[in-house]
Amino acid sequence: MSTTRTPKVSERVAPKPADPQPAKKKRGEDDDGPDFRTLLHAWLESHRASMADSLRRLGKQPIGSFFTCLVMAVALSMPMGLSLLLKNIEQLGGSWQRAAQISLFLKLDAGSRDGEALRDEIKGMPGVADAQYVSREQALEEFQQQSGLGEALRELPDNPLPGVVVVTPTEVDKPALEALRQRLSELPRVEVAQLDLVWVERLAAILKLGDRFVFGLAVMLISALLLVIGNTIRLHIENRRIEIEVIKLVGGTDAYVRRPFLYMGALYGLGAGLLAWGILAFGLNWLNEAVVGLSGLYGSDFALGGVPASDGLSLLIGAVLLGYIGAWIAVARHLNELAPR
């Protein structure tokens, strides 16, 4: 009699395990790699580390770093200081504008009312800062005092001097003054419109010479500044040559190698800009004491202005950019030499 064999428990077929469910992806991730936030965090962390490393290396050589910034600051402050002095000269009590006055000699039959009405009309014209009327009587009195011919002039039967309207223009360049003089000469009651261009031309020549001198000096000193920062960064590159070669050997990119040196150049520029701002503020304040004393002897209250905040910020931004550009040029020049041997 045959019997049916019952399988043992160990021989029973175990059920197939269920297929593992794929892990849920975090929001924002895809199959191609990390999300944008992760990449941004890594990028920012890399820049933070590069800046911290640059600060640490500059802090290890405080004296050398300070003198490098000081040399750059002197190069920055010289053209900026001359430019500020030119601006102060242009504002010297308005004397430049007074030197460019236009004198309108009226006809002899023009009375005081005609002259005052003409003065009021001219004040409302574009390009005119101010207008003053000098009557015939006032003109004769001033001429008597200045010429010393008072007794002789009193013997004249009639006053030979006309009334004058003295016009102060807003612009001091020659073409604008000529155009204004031509318009004023066409007004009624005006006999002659006289413009003394000698002082205007002298002013234009002085300011033009000063501007060109400042521009040329700025170009030369900026070139020297780029050489200074470039040579400084080159020395830092040479000191880290082995480290850089190892980084490139393990796959470090040129951007990764370049980054700390760019931050170092920008930090040099920032320090130089702050020092230059301080040098300018101290220098102008030091000169101002002598200028105030000199102007007081001439009955003027002229004083040198300080460094405007806008100019100071422009100086800082320009210094940082120059340091960055100088470092970029130095690294780009030596980057090909840093390939692993």
UniProtKB/Swiss-Prot annotation:
Keywords: Cell cycle, Cell division, Cell inner membrane, Cell membrane, Membrane, Transmembrane, Transmembrane helix. It is a multi-pass membrane protein. It comes from the Bacteria. GO terms for cellular component: cell division site; Gram-negative-bacterium-type cell wall; plasma membrane. Residues 1-65, 234-263, 333-341 are cytoplasmic. Gene3D superfamilies: 3.30.70.3040. Residues 1-34 are annotated as: Disordered. Belongs to the ABC-4 integral membrane protein family. FtsX subfamily. This is Cell division protein FtsX. It comes from Pseudomonas putida (Arthrobacter siderocapsulatus).
